[in-house]
């Protein structure tokens, strides 16, 4: 009986605190590749720059790196990504940050209860440059682990 209760408790904790999602796009490559499983923590919706958010957009679950939070102003210029007037440089991003022709107009200020996300694979990412800020209510959680599924 104790073993059954322990197993039930583990299942309940995992179900309410954590989640798993298969990511079927290349927006976050190489950090998260097409087909990878992402484990996320559901209970903490406070994001800082650099966190990876797992969220629903257009009926599918995807991921993006948080670059701005409520109150921040995002601009994309010929110099690249700017947050609150400061150029952002990251050794982990291998591509220039550019605007999309049919995307949102910049600069944009992130509203209360929202985040602005970009994919690490900037040329192929479907991110806030296209659909704008993400409402926290659409966020499933904060990514905490990536499980590679290639070859499984």
Positions of predicted regions on the chain:
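Short acidic/polar alpha-helix capping motifs at helix-coil junctions
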Residues: 1-2, 28-31
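Hydrophobic membrane-insertion alpha-helices, especially the h-region
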Residues: 2-17
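Soluble "head" domains of membrane/secretory-pathway proteins
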Residues: 16-22, 30-152
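A short acidic/basic microdomain associated with nuclease active sites
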Residues: 25
């Amino acid at each position: 009986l104790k073993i059954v209760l322990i197993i039930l408790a583990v299942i309940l904790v995992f179900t309410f605190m954590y989640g798993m999602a298969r990511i079927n796009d290349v927006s976050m490559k190489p950090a998260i590749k097409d087909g990878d499983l992402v484990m996320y923590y559901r209970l903490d919706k406070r994001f800082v720059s650099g966190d990876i958010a797992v969220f629903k957009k257009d009926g599918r679950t995807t991921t993006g790196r948080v670059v701005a939070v409520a109150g921040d102003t995002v601009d994309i210029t010929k110099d690249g990504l700017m947050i609150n007037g400061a150029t952002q440089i990251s050794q982990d991003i291998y591509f220039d940050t550019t605007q999309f022709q049919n995307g949102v107009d910049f600069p944009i200020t992130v509203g209360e209860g929202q985040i602005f996300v970009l994919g690490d694979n900037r040329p192929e990412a479907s991110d806030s440059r296209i659909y704008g800020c993400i409402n926290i209510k659409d966020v499933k959680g904060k990514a905490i682990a990536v499980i590679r599924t290639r070859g499984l």
